Swiss-Prot record:
Pfam families: 2OG-FeII_Oxy_3, PKHD_C. PROSITE patterns: FE2OG_OXY. Its cofactor is Fe(2+); L-ascorbate. This is PKHD-type hydroxylase Synpcc7942_0015. NCBIfam families: PRK05467.1-3 (NF003974), PRK05467.1-4 (NF003975). Its EC number is 1.14.11.-. It comes from Synechococcus elongatus (strain ATCC 33912 / PCC 7942 / FACHB-805) (Anacystis nidulans R2).
Length: 223
């Protein structure tokens, strides 16, 4: 399941991040890639531990926590490993799959879902599409600044070469309460249906039955 969340950031949040990134110091993005992804990763990123990165991470984390669609689609247990990246002309991130586990030592988080928060409007750069491969085809995304794409970490994906301009983005990962993507999609559909029913009919018998089923499936499947 791939979800687009329009305008995750409000104007003030987006402006704060964009203005901060314009003058930020970036490092080689290969530092955080897996050994095989390093071969195809050509971009720059903020150091995760820098004061600026931490302050911008807080803005994004707050926006995610306050977004009902993100909560309903991801069932986030932990949102982790946020990175702010920059692509200059000629840079790309070739075909790869994200690491299943991230972190080191005793603290490792599972990557069930990945997200890309676009921080540059599409008319500010040429190329640089995020391309997600499926079994039979592939889909390319270039969303407005402030919008987010949420997709399974199990997919093969890439960022096409930037031909002109600069592409800024924030990427991150989610360890979900619902590990199985098929179960997660069933819960999302069921929750969407019961909320739609409530909007039309209020707290009906049918709504209560759907809510009972939803709650008990969530109780059974969460981990």
């Amino acid at each position: 399941m791939i979800i687009t969340i329009d305008a995750l950031l409000d104007a003030a949040q987006l402006n704060k991040i964009q203005s901060s990134l314009q003058t930020a110091e970036f490092i080689d993005g290969r530092a955080t890639a897996g050994w095989h992804a390093q071969l195809v990763k050509q971009n720059q990123q903020l150091s995760r531990t820098s004061t600026l990165a931490k302050s911008l991470q807080e803005i994004v984390q707050t926006a995610l926590q306050n977004n009902a669609l993100f909560e309903a689609a991801a069932y986030p247990q932990r949102v982790h490993s946020l990175l702010f990246s920059r692509y200059e002309p000629g840079m790309e991130y070739g075909r790869h799959v994200d690491n299943a586990l991230m972190g080191s030592g005793d603290r490792r988080d599972r990557a069930d879902l990945s997200f890309t928060l676009f921080l540059s409007d599409p008319d500010r750069y040429i190329g640089g599409a995020l391309v997600i491969e499926g079994a039979c085809d592939e889909q390319a995304y270039r969303l407005p600044a402030g919008s987010l794409l949420l997709y399974p970490s199990s997919t093969l994906h890439r960022v096409d070469p930037v031909e002109q301009g600069y592409r800024f983005a924030c990427v991150g990962w989610v360890q979900s309460w619902i590990r199985d993507p098929a179960k997660r999609e069933l819960l999302f559909d069921l929750d969407t249906a019961r909320r739609s029913l409530f909007t039309r009919e209020g707290k009906s018998i049918e709504f209560d039955l759907l809510s009972k089923t939803y709650a008990n499936l969530l109780r059974r499947w969460s981990e």
